[in-house]
């Protein structure tokens, strides 16, 4: 897999993560879905992997690449892990640092990109990268950098979207384009930047990361019921926070839309 061309990368709206004001933690803003809908699944999966490898929180350093407003980083820090978050957006980092202080959490936030991580080799026991890989222009470089900063035996946990017909309909058409159900900003995701499982497996192998598994991600309700909730959210009858609490994301045997996985250095 190669670096995304400029004409495709320029279509994506990454500026949503760089808006004025504390958007990340507001119940009436789309980014709140990370907290209410996706975080419980991501944290639960990560803890399962940690337990599998008998990882001890107080002695384990975790880096979140693309931490945004710190929603996932805070959950990891609450578990007792030594937590660092990195993001290219100064405004997101400002929001993250402010909320961490209010929550009495010690988290090290730094500005930077996944393509050029400002850390020494072999710095972290764990790297997390959730809903980020499909936003970067140079995915091979990001994976290379993640491998570089991971300690030997370290774990890389990630989730992303598969590039399939089903993901195009659900994540692009329904969530972003078709007004009856769309609840996400236009161009939040660009389908051509979605990543097939075999593509990321190949990149992991090239960068000395031993791929272990992929698990699909799906809602724990029927898609018909989810469409009803989407319609209510699109019509303003539910806040993003209320929508995100209507159902859970769970593991699936199908990786056709979203998937999560990990690799070991």
Task: Please place each PLM-identified region on the residue numbering.
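N-terminal, positively charged/glycine-rich alpha-helical extensions of SAM-dependent methyltransferases
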Residues: 1-28
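Conserved alpha-helix/loop element of class I SAM-dependent methyltransferases that forms part
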Residues: 36-58
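Acceptor-substrate binding/catalytic loop of class I
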Residues: 160, 180-199
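A short glycine-rich, Lys/Arg-flanked "PGG" loop and its adjoining helix->strand segment in the class I
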Residues: 140-152
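Class I SAM-dependent methyltransferase SAM/SAH-binding core
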Residues: 69-116
